[in-house]
Amino acid sequence: MKILVCENYDKLSEKAAQIIMSQITLKSNSILGLATGSTPIGMYKKLVEMYENKMIDFSDVKTFNLDEYQNLPISNDQSYHYFMDDNLFNYINVKRENIHIPNGMANDIENECIEYDNLIKEAGGIDIQVLGIGNNAHIGFNEPTVSFEKKTYVVELEESTKIANARFFNSLDEVPSKAITMGIGSIFESKKIMLLATGENKAKAIYDTIYGKVTPEVPASILQFHDDVIVILDKKAASLLNPKDYKVV
């Protein structure tokens, strides 16, 4: 596990975008695993800038998103389809047919989960998976105690996660209670994983992820067993780590 600590959020976003750009430069038809939430927004802005400056070409890239709310229309401005269009896809030359996000409106939701994993496999697997992390160390919508073997599935959202996401809705009641998420088993199959975290409120989750026992109680702790993980933090998120364990960039 490689840990990089950046001066601030802007530098973190720049570093993460550079890693994505390097991946696409190396392999023009890269398969990207993408995440939503506030943390990767800066990275997406940097990627759009890189595209506008002709530094990066997404025309052969395929993308797979981690998750989507169940029973929330994609036209809703809180759906992850909308989020990805608004923050990235509308501003780059990725082909629509190469964008994959779980369909939370599917009639057969169980089949949607199976098909999503099959699509990833058929594409050749995810080359680099972007992750954020929750205060309780959840990744995707994989909450504490979920099995590390789990593939894409429907999850009942924890109250703490609903409260954390309520800021994006008019009220807590409007936050969907279920979502489709790539399971930890699906995430772990990615060839490379890039975990991003900022802020003091993530410091404990990062500490437990890196130093703690590998346990379903700390979902992100499974990353200790992955062969190729890069963790990019700002100073506050890294505040509990031993400085000898990370590189300041």
From Swiss-Prot:
GO cellular component, one term: cytoplasm
Biological or metabolic pathway of the protein: Amino-sugar metabolism; N-acetylneuraminate degradation; D-fructose 6-phosphate from N-acetylneuraminate: step 5/5
Superkingdom of the source species: Bacteria
Molecular function per GO: glucosamine-6-phosphate deaminase activity; identical protein binding
InterPro entries: Glc/Gal-6P_isomerase, Glucosamine6P_isomerase, NagB/RpiA_transferase-like
Catalytic residues of the enzyme: D67 (proton acceptor), N136 (for ring-opening step), H138 (proton acceptor), E143 (for ring-opening step)
Cysteine disulfide links: none
Catalytic activity: alpha-D-glucosamine 6-phosphate + H2O = beta-D-fructose 6-phosphate + NH4(+)
Keyword terms, alphabetized: Carbohydrate metabolism, Hydrolase
Stated role: Catalyzes the reversible isomerization-deamination of glucosamine 6-phosphate (GlcN6P) to form fructose 6-phosphate (Fru6P) and ammonium ion.
Name assigned to this protein: Glucosamine-6-phosphate deaminase
Species annotation: Clostridium botulinum (strain Alaska E43 / Type E3)
Encoding gene per record: nagB
